[in-house]
Regions:
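Aromatic side chains
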Residues: 28, 82-85, 166, 177
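Acyl-donor-binding surface of acyltransferase catalytic domains
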Residues: 1-69, 73
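A conserved beta-strand-loop-helix scaffold within acyl/acetyltransferase catalytic domains
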Residues: 57-142, 156
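Acyl-donor binding region in acyl/amide transferases
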Residues: 2-22, 104-106, 116-119, 123-179
């Protein structure tokens, strides 16, 4: 395969709300409120999910707050966490905190030592709880906040009578916490 080129073409589709569930089950995920993209999404069946003892122990160290109101001070703190997160992961900054907020129905933020250290934005589509964005500041890596976030998302998803949690794309080693 000499002299072969790979052409990357981003592909998205605009859906009606009554189509969300069908497309979600086929591997599509919301990039924005209007545009969905095809991905290898990770899905947790809530009937089968059981957190480990380690996750339950770590979760006790973290205070969590479900919230739908966004104050300017909190927005600024979450933006700083997001900036640290994408820098730590080496990701490109293709979304702003405002994009994330507008593409969600609500969020959870996590407090450790009286500081907000992480957040998770979500939306609900029928019986599915979708993780829109999760980020943390990596100030205390031993907290394993990715695993703790999955646990708390499972509690909120069950409360909202969801059957599944979708945690967006799952590629490579950076998504191991989703498994």
């Amino acid at each position: 395969m000499r002299n072969q080129n790979i052409i990357y073409v981003p592909f998205g589709v605009m859906l009606e709300p009554n189509e969300y569930k069908e497309y979600l089950e086929q591997g599509w995920y919301p990039a924005t409120n209007d545009i969905w993209f095809q991905t290898r999404s990770t899905r947790i069946n809530l009937e089968l999910y059981k957190p480990t003892k380690t996750v339950l122990r770590l979760a006790k160290k973290i205070k969590y707050f479900p919230d739908v109101n966004m104050t300017p001070a909190k927005r600024e703190r979450l933006a700083r966490i997001y900036d640290k997160y994408i820098a730590h992961k080496g990701y490109s900054d293709d979304m702003s905190i405002d994009d994330i907020i507008s593409n969600s129905h609500g969020h959870i933020y996590y407090v450790y030592n009286n500081e907000i250290v992480a957040f998770a934005f979500h939306k609900v589509v029928e019986d599915a709880y979708l993780g829109i964005e999760f980020a943390w500041d990596y100030g205390e890596p031993k907290l394993s906040l990715g695993h703790v976030n999955v646990y708390y998302n499972s509690l909120f998803a069950r409360f909202k009578r969801c059957k599944y949690i979708y945690l967006s794309s799952g590629y490579e080693s950076c998504s191991i916490y989703k498994s």
